[in-house]
């Protein structure tokens, strides 16, 4: 299982980003809470459709779930099309991934 978390910084000790589509970074973890990938979001400055573009990018990376403080309606629609679960949750990235995997 791959879980992507929208992050304010490129660091697992960062805060979860309040916005999914325009989050500055994404960190991807495996089912053991291990960070397996991190990257800058190339769609933060896109005029429109950032959330849809992020959903497609995460699908291409094989992500099963994405976590952010909030999601726009177009992004949630795109995630549902890609069959990616989504969860609105805040806090520190490192704590959030552990909490989600415990549930």
Where are the model-predicted features located?
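C-terminal structural segments of small proteins and small subunits
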Residues: 70-103
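Extreme N-terminal starter segment of soluble prokaryotic enzymes
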Residues: 1-3
């Amino acid at each position: 299982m791959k879980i992507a978390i929208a992050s304010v910084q490129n660091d697992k000790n960062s805060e979860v980003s309040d916005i999914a589509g325009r989050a500055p970074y994404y960190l991807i973890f495996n089912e053991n809470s291990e960070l397996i990938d991190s990257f800058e979001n190339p769609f933060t400055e896109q005029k429109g459709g950032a959330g849809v573009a992020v959903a497609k990018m995460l699908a291409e990376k094989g992500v099963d779930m994405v976590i952010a403080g909030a999601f726009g309606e177009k992004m949630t629609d795109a995630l549902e099309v890609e069959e990616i679960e989504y969860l609105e949750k805040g806090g520190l990235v490192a704590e959030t991934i552990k909490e989600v995997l415990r549930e």
